[in-house]
A protein has these predicted regions:
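Non-catalytic nucleic-acid substrate-recognition regions in nucleic-acid-modifying enzymes
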Residues: 46-113, 120-139
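Redox-cofactor binding/interface segments in oxidoreductases and associated redox assembly factors
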Residues: 119, 294-295
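Conserved hydrophobic/aromatic pocket- or pore-lining residues that grip, position, or stack substrates
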Residues: 188, 207, 224, 296
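Non-catalytic substrate-recognition/targeting regions of SAM-dependent transferases
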Residues: 95, 99-111, 133-202, 209
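Class I SAM-dependent methyltransferase "Motif I" SAM/SAH-binding loop
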Residues: 222-228
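Class I S-adenosyl-L-methionine-dependent methyltransferase catalytic core
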Residues: 1-63, 194-196, 200-209, 214, ...
Length: 309
């Protein structure tokens, strides 16, 4: 009833998101040795919130089944935050990998995107019990927001699998939740939920920075350009012109958006949908010359033009 108060004592604070109310007080306590929280609510219309749907894309309901094992992950994340996180802050890097299956019990990749967290669970081999794998993932999803001090709505979880055919390009969800991140003076658009990948390959960061440092006055070619992040670095670095090609119309549009975010001249920095291998084999291509070429072909072979994705 309006005006009443509600108290919930839980070892899984994430369950509080399912109540449909915003808590006005949160107390960190213990249930024996288990960390817990006391959540206080006022039943008022203005405190209503949309209950979190555990079946929604990227949602895994957290639960700690083995506190000792969860403590191991908690301590590892704290250690990585102290070392990798400190290094990233000193380098003014906002997007980086914090954890990459450091512990065999938790086969995850945890990436930071300027205050948001992207978690990918590596597909467990058939020898691993599926129930045990789900249990460990639920533990990780309880520990990660606690250690990283991130709101649950800013944490996304996916299962990482080897992609074949056009699956790498297909949508996993349809939230349309894009936001901008920053890297060496460039603004880049990312999406943590809708696709297998986010729009920014973190392991390419040193190469992108090198391109930016060496692009001034150069003609730049980006084959299999994905979202065009390398082209953005080239443009920001002063490339005289660039051509970026990809088979996916989704990523061609994304690359164009990235260039527009950085005020690159679309007449000088062109993005086109094309089969890169066919383009290389075309005799007309021989008349075009470039000073810098970046080529990162996908891990699968697919000769069909992906005109519809």
């Amino acid at each position: 009833l309006p005006g009443w108060r509600l108290a919930v004592f839980t070892g899984v604070p994430e369950f509080g998101k399912s109540i449909g109310l915003r808590s006005f007080k949160q107390y960190k306590l213990f249930n024996g040795k288990l960390p817990a929280q006391l959540l206080l609510f006022e039943i008022q219309p203005e405190n209503a919130r949309t209950p979190r749907d555990p079946a929604a894309p990227g949602q895994v309901m957290p639960r700690i089944a083995n506190p000792e094992r969860a403590d191991m992950l908690r301590n590892r994340l704290k250690k990585n935050l102290k070392t990798i996180g400190q290094w990233a802050r000193k380098q003014n890097i906002g997007c980086y990998r914090l954890y990459d299956a450091d512990m065999p019990e938790y086969a995850l990749a945890i990436d930071i995107y300027e205050g948001r967290v992207h978690v990918q669970e590596y597909l467990a081999p058939k020898s691993i019990d599926e129930k045990a794998a789900r249990e460990r993932l639920a533990e990780a999803m309880a520990v990660i927001p606690e250690v990283l001090e991130v709101a649950p709505e800013n944490l996304v979880c996916k299962q990482r699998q080897r992609q074949t055919g056009t699956k790498q390009y297909e949508k996993q969800a349809a939230t349309g939740e894009y936001f901008n991140v920053h890297e060496h003076g460039c603004t880049l658009k990312v999406n943590l939920k809708d696709y297998l990948d986010t729009g920014l390959f973190l392991d390419h960061r040193p190469v992108r920075h090198w391109i930016q440092q060496h692009a001034r006055g150069k003609r730049f070619l980006n084959l299999f350009c994905y979202t065009g992040a390398a082209t953005v670095h080239a443009a920001v670095g002063g490339a005289s012109r660039s051509l970026s090609l990809d088979m996916s119309k989704t990523y061609v549009s994304w690359a164009q958006d990235n260039l527009a975010l950085n005020r690159a001249d679309s007449r000088k920095h062109v993005v086109e949908q094309a089969d890169c291998l066919a383009w290389l084999a075309d005799r007309k291509t021989a008349n075009q010359t470039f000073d810098l070429i970046f080529m990162d072909p996908p891990t699968f072979s697919n000769s069909a033009r992906m005109a519809g994705v």
